[in-house]
Each structure stands twice: as structure tokens, then as C-alpha cells.
């Protein structure tokens, strides 16, 4: 009986958050261990389906860097990085699109469908959703930046009561152009702004933003975040994550969260509990 009462209490505790975020768009950047562990994949799908069933509008933007690197190695295609960003030749671009659109995107859609949510997978090329431009073609090739976003196709998916699953590949207006490989964190941030999302969450392989003693910082303002970057507390791979958070917040998103995707049901814990499990950044 006690277990049953605990279940009811948990549901009641979540009720204020369900009411608060009902009918709100929530962008989730999906990557890291949560994207490679079979158990965590299932839990992620369950979390998204539950959020969708209680009236929220989750939008998934996924990466796939490790899978891309593995397939490139298997095929004997050289790949290089500059400052942590992949140099995308035309041959690499073809494989990037194969992995992101043809493999990972479809796997996520299938997972969500299997757990009871209607999901529709697209890339930024579909419906003219994302238009790209070169980051620095001479050095980075087809690694790009987002020039323009037309949210109509994603809005239509949401209006059809489905979950959009987006591969971060941008199209071009040039006939025959292979498109652009877009950093998934950057894509998620820009998409959240364009779709007027309430929240954006980044699933990572760390607990969140850590202080110099390696303790989790649960809440930050933009100013505090910038200061932690300047003094070197935030460094390495966390820098582009917090930059993406800041860009989203300055574009009108209310809150940005960096959470540990290795924690069971981390999405639900962050959205439906008062304490959360990661770092929340806000204006």
C-alpha cells in the first residue's frame, strides 16, 4: 500500500509542472550516452512520450558525431577537426547525411512510435526548414551555420499532434549543393528561438555546469555564466553548450537546462520536479 501511495504522491508533485508547461514547446538536444546506451534510449523515449501525453510539445534535435566518426573510420575516409569542429568535405558530408538522416533519425522515430507517440523525422533540408551558409569554407568545407529558418514544416508536425525529430543538416539555394553539416547544439538553440519554445534542454555526459571544486551549479544567470567562462571555470566542451543556452535565452526562450543524460529519466526529473538534476540558466 505504501508503494501505491508513493506513486500517487509523485504524480501529485508533478501536477503543477504539468499544468505550467502544458501546450508549451520544449526543445530537447539529444546526444551523448543517452543516444548510445540501449537502456537510456528506451528511457529517453519513455520520457518524451510521457511529456507529449500530458500536453507538452517536445521537439527533438539530435546529433550523431560518434556514429559519424565510426562509419568514416570503417569506410577509410579521413576526417579532421579544428577547435573541436569537424571539417566536412563533400565525401564526409554525404556520410554525415547518411548517418544523421538515414540511421539515427529513423531509430529515434521508431523508438518513439514503439512507446506510443506519433513521431515524424525530418532533416533541415525538408520543406526548406533550415537554410545554411558556410562557416568558413576554406577551412571547414561544408560545416555550416544557419542562415534562415522557416518553421512551417515543424509547426505542421506539431499541429498534427506528432513529435518532430530533426537531423541538423541545412539546405542551400544552390542547385546540386550537398547541404551543410550544422553543430547540433547550435541548431537546437536556433530552432528553439524560431519556434518560440518555452524551454531548451541539452542532454550531456556531465552532471551540468561544475564549479572549480567540481560541484554542480544548479542555477545561473547569463551574467554569472559569462563570468565563469572568463575565469576558466567553464571550459572545453561545455563552452559551446552554454553559448547555445545563452543564444536561446537572448532569443526569447525562458529557461535553458544542461542535464546529465546518463541519469535515469533525467528529462522527467528536470522538468517535473522542483529540484531538477542539472544546471538551469536563465536571464
UniProtKB/Swiss-Prot annotation:
Binding locations of substrate: 64-65, 86, 181
Cross-referenced Gene3D superfamilies: Acetylglutamate kinase-like
GO molecular function: acetylglutamate kinase activity; ATP binding
Family under the similarity heading: Belongs to the acetylglutamate kinase family. ArgB subfamily.
Subcellular location: Cytoplasm
Record's protein name: Acetylglutamate kinase
Keyword Transport appears in the UniProt entry: no
Amino acid at each position: 500500500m505504501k508503494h501505491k501511495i508513493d506513486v500517487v504522491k509523485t504524480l501529485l508533485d508533478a501536477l503543477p509542472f504539468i499544468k505550467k508547461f502544458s501546450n508549451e514547446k520544449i526543445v530537447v538536444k539529444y546526444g551523448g550516452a543517452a543516444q548510445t546506451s540501449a537502456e537510456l534510449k528506451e528511457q529517453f523515449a519513455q520520457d518524451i512520450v510521457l511529456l507529449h501525453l500530458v500536453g507538452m510539445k517536445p521537439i527533438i534535435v539530435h546529433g550523431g558525431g560518434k556514429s559519424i566518426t565510426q562509419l568514416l573510420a570503417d569506410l577509410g575516409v579521413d576526417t579532421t577537426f579544428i577547435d573541436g569542429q569537424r571539417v566536412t568535405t563533400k565525401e564526409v558530408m554525404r556520410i554525415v547525411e547518411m548517418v544523421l538522416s538515414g540511421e539515427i533519425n529513423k531509430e529515434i522515430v521508431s523508438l518513439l512510435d514503439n512507446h506510443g507517440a506519433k513521431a515524424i523525422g525530418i532533416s533541415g533540408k525538408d520543406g526548406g526548414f533550415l537554410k545554411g551558409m558556410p562557416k568558413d569554407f576554406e577551412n571547414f568545407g561544408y560545416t555550416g551555420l544557419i542562415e534562415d529558418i522557416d518553421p512551417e514544416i515543424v509547426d505542421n508536425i506539431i499541429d498534427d499532434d506528432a513529435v518532430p525529430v530533426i537531423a541538423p543538416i541545412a539546405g542551400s539555394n544552390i542547385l546540386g549543393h550537398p547541404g551543410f553539416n550544422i553543430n547540433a547544439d547550435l541548431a537546437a538553440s536556433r530552432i528553439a528561438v524560431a519556434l518560440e519554445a518555452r524551454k531548451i534542454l541539452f542532454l550531456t555526459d556531465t552532471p551540468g555546469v561544475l564549479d572549480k571544486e567540481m560541484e554542480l551549479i544548479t542555477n545561473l544567470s547569463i551574467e554569472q555564466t559569462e563570468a565563469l567562462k572568463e575565469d576558466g571555470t567553464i571550459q572545453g566542451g561545455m563552452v559551446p553548450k552554454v553559448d547555445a543556452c545563452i543564444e536561446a535565452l537572448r532569443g526569447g526562450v525562458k529557461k535553458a537546462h544542461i542535464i546529465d543524460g546518463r541519469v535515469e529519466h533525467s528529462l522527467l526529473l528536470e522538468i517535473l520536479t522542483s529540484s531538477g538534476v542539472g544546471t538551469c540558466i536563465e536571464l
